Amino acid sequence: MIVVAGEALIDLVPSSQSPSGDGPLPALLPRRGGGPYNTALALGRLGSPAAFCSRVSTDTFGEELLRGLRADGVDTSLVQRGTEPTTLAVADISPDGSAGYGFYADGTADRLFTLPAELPAAARAVSFGTCSMVLEPGASAYEALLRRSAQQGIFTALDPNIRAGLIGDPDAYRARFRAWLPHVTLLKLSEEDADWLAGAEGVAAAVKDWLAAGPAAVVLTRGGDGLSVLTPGGAEIAVPGAQVEVADTIGAGDTVNAALLHRLDAHGALSPDTLAALSPYAWRDILGFAARAAAVTCSRPGAQPPYATELVGPE
């Protein structure tokens, strides 16, 4: 089982990219979202045994979030519940399909997550990231779960998925990020997030430092230009992006997270040792699968990751 730990929220996505003339503003369409939520959903759709570990509101949005997971086979028994409202993220879609977000997260249910007693014995990997690693007091509980999972020998994956507007002290966050790395097996991040985290050091030097701190691999995504993996031994393997007409990029990175974990599992590589021993051929297969999965998500509005049947066929 792959456990995904983090927030579930509602994305409010404009029905069109810009208002016309003096007419009304575009309607905002509610869609299920949150980086970890999207990752869990994508794992379920790909056919991986997956569970979601979070705190979700008992309001109507919360019920819909859980219904969506269950419909795609995701175990929700690790979800804590609360009467506080669901976090809202208002999306701003650029002409190229990229998305920015404004968050309404004060006093919401997901940020009151507490450390669970234990994960199921079947848990072989735990994935973390996004707002849940920033917003207290829940962030400290997720961090504790990351550390405990690593100490228990469980494969851990981290996608920082930076939301700069939620980070009050960037330098403090960067220091906290570096403190997580000894407990991370696989670090995946976008090129933009890597640049933000690296600061003046530069991405190339920073990635070397991050690898030296603990991860067995770092995967960098470059949007339509594809993605690459870097390893502590200095290897770099890259694959191109899959060409598609982009509706928007919401959930694309989350789909990559799920596709990486799903395909790593297929290669028997959900452990630090087996991850470090993967061949270039295996990595090209894993990265190529992730690129194709993300392209499907980008081809339709909102975070709608692909089902396994949509990825069958010529590569």
Regions found by a protein language model. Name each.
Residues 131-208, 225-226:
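Conserved beta-alpha-beta core of the PfkB/ribokinase-like small-molecule kinase fold
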Residues 1-75:
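Glycine-rich phosphate/adenosyl-contacting loop at the front of the ribokinase-like
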Residues 43, 190, 253:
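Short, conserved phosphate/pyrophosphate- and ester-handling motifs at nucleotide-, phospho-/glycolipid
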Residues 1-3, 124-125, 186:
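Structural motif
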Residues 8, 35, 131, 160, ...:
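Active-site metal-binding loops of divalent metal-dependent hydrolases
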Residues 3, 201-315:
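Conserved phosphate-binding/catalytic region of the ribokinase-like
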